[in-house]
Amino acid sequence: MADAYSNAAASAGYDVHRIEVAQLAFPLLRTQADFETGALPPELVQPSEDLRWAQHWVFLFPLWHGTMPALFKGFLEQAFRPGFAMEYNPKGFPRRLLAGRSARIVVTMGMPALMYRWYFGAYGVRGFERSMLSFAGIKPIRESLYGLTFADEKKRARWLEEMRRYGERGD
């Protein structure tokens, strides 16, 4: 799905920078002090610059235990430090430093997407949207949820075509 989206976006003339979090080796944040004042690990400097540069972000991940994989969450915690995603304001709400950007969240899962939305309330995706992306000023945020259970080849081909269309539109 990531290939379908990024290849179509590049073919449509968009400048695509891919960050494959699973290929990165970085330490997890362990204290509030590390989050607030610690240095960004060297291996995350370029990915962080790529995020700051991009006007549209696409996050694609598998659903693990109802939410994003821990490594992806650890990456976001490192990247979304004060001064990158928001700036604290002692007199009110933090200043949103990522305003003007948009995002698409693409999630694959081993259950029907309708069940994740209806029964589980899509809490992992909603939490990501509200507590990180929206809070930092990113909007609009669109989501695409794909339940791989019972998906035949025809349905999977439609999903890849959908990703290509999103890529072509830069959506």
Indicate where each model-derived feature is located.
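N-terminal beta1-alpha1 ligand-phosphate binding loop
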Residues: 1-14, 19
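Anion (oxyanion) recognition and catalysis
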Residues: 10, 52, 134
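Glycine-rich phosphate/pyrophosphate-binding loop and the adjoining helix
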Residues: 118-171
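N-terminal beta-loop-helix "entrance" segment that forms/cooperates
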Residues: 18-40, 156
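Hydrophobic/aromatic beta-strand patches that form the interior of the parallel beta-sheet core
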Residues: 17-19, 58, 104-107, 141-144
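Helix-loop-strand module that forms the ligand-binding subsite of alpha/beta enzymes
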Residues: 39-129
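Generic structural signal for helix capping and beta-alpha/helix-loop junctions
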Residues: 25-26, 68, 113, 150
